[in-house]
From Swiss-Prot:
Gene3D superfamilies named in the record: Rhodanese-like domain
Active site (UniProt): C101 (s-selanylcysteine intermediate)
PROSITE patterns the record matches: RHODANESE_3
Species assigned in the record: Cronobacter sakazakii (strain ATCC BAA-894)
Name of the protein described by the UniProt record: tRNA 2-selenouridine synthase
Biological role stated in the UniProt entry: Involved in the post-transcriptional modification of the uridine at the wobble position (U34) of tRNA(Lys), tRNA(Glu) and tRNA(Gln). Catalyzes the conversion of 2-thiouridine (S2U-RNA) to 2-selenouridine (Se2U-RNA). Acts in a two-step process involving geranylation of 2-thiouridine (S2U) to S-geranyl-2-thiouridine (geS2U) and subsequent selenation of the latter derivative to 2-selenouridine (Se2U) in the tRNA chain.
Length: 377
């Protein structure tokens, strides 16, 4: 419970809310939340999907007062008490948060009033999700126009690790929950496009707030295509990336294979096992993941080459399950890199020949970036 002297005001400062990453108690219906939400948002709806649809139909046919009356009849008694209790607990757990609905209107106001009747004063976001969303898109467009450098290199070069290690790095693949290749999906589902964009804006705002400690800051991003799995990059960011200088990481095949072995065969198998609990189910899901990654590019490989690699993959999977040994995967992964992924990336890199600013191994690129782009004051 907050006393009047401690009451926090409602906020219309969407930029500050996104930058700070405050918790939002989002009272929109689940279907709205699934289409797009802000980082830190918790969906505790005033109305479920069916209730919202019924109230919306009533509003169109009979007007606002009739729709409001229907809403109160639908969210009544035990249903109302259960939702109030969920909001109360969320307010206690997140005392610095805000209520949020679609436009900062009736739904967040009703929840705020109901909470106030229980002695809980909790502020709302004026303008709601719509204002936050617009601020997020504007921020991404604005910040995307700042200087940047891309990290390029063949699969397994350690590009993502470099991005994550640098103070101005934005991990686009991490935000998208996808690593960009046919084997790129993770166990975390990809976000809706709007949610991906909102998380990207929040990451850029949060990182940019720390740029004052750097003498010559640039964004550091992995050299991506326009799509990362099902998510596409915002247009302005994509346009700037197409013109940005590129630092190319050149690592020997053996080192790349070791990175990929750890990430795709050791860590992914453990992740499937942890997620599913049952050992047999974990192995089936992990096997399906590897099978699908290779199957997705079968036409580009050619069916004969695909069949050859698939047989090697199956043998490596059987060996891994039997002995725990993962190096057998190199029998299909090495030719896949050398015959498919590497030529494809080199072809793309040739188009950017004039943009290449530096070449070196992982540690050389790291040192070059830190010296030229991320030097501390």
């Amino acid at each position: 419970m907050q006393k009047d002297a401690q009451r926090r005001p409602d906020s219309d400062d969407a930029l500050a809310l996104i930058t700070r990453g405050v918790t939002l108690i989002d009272v929109r219906a689940p279907v709205e939340f699934a289409q797009g939400a802000m980082p830190g948002a918790i969906n505790l709806p005033l109305m479920n999907n069916d209730e919202r649809a019924a109230v919306g139909t009533c509003y169109k046919q009979h007007g606002q007062q009739a729709a409001l009356a229907l809403g109160h009849r639908l969210v009544y008694g035990e249903v109302r008490e259960a939702r109030l209790n969920a909001w109360r607990l969320a307010c206690e757990r997140h005392p610095e948060g805000f209520l949020c609905c679609a436009r900062g209107g009736m739904r967040s106001y009703i929840v705020q009033q109901w909470l106030r009747e229980r002695g809980i004063d909790y502020p709302l976001v004026e303008g709601g999700y719509k204002r936050l969303r617009q601020e997020a898109m504007d921020a991404t467009d604005r910040l995307s126009r700042l200087p940047m450098v891309l990290i390029g290199g063949c699969t397994g070069s350690g590009k993502t690790q470099l991005v994550k290690a640098l103070p101005t790095g934005i991990d686009l693949e991490g935000l998208a929950h996808h690593r960009g290749s046919s084997f790129g999906r993770t166990l975390t589902p990809q976000r809706a496009q709007a949610s991906f964009e909102n998380h990207l804006a929040a990451a850029m705002l949060n990182h940019h707030a720390r740029w004052t400690t750097l003498s010559n800051p640039f964004w550091v991003l992995e050299d991506e295509g326009k799509m990362i799995g099902a998510n596409h990059l915002p247009a302005v960011l994509r346009e700037q990336m197409l013109q940005a200088p590129v630092a190319v990481v050149e690592e020997p095949l053996e080192r790349r294979l070791e990175r990929l072995r750890e990430e795709y065969f050791v860590q992914m198998q453990a992740a499937f096992q942890a997620a599913l609990g049952d050992e047999a189910a974990g192995w089936r899901a992990y096997g399906d993941y590897l099978h699908h990654g290779l199957y997705a590019i079968r036409r580009r490989l050619g069916l004969a080459r695909y069949a050859e690699l698939a047989a090697l993959q199956e043998a490596a999977l059987a060996r891994q399950q039997r002995t725990g040994e993962t190096h057998a995967h190199f029998a299909w992964l090495a030719p896949l890199l050398e015959g498919y992924y590497d030529p494809m990336y080199r072809y793309q890199l040739e188009k950017k020949a004039q943009q290449i600013a530096f070449r070196g191994d992982y540690h050389q690129v790291d040192a070059w970036l830190r010296h030229r782009y991320c030097a501390s004051r």
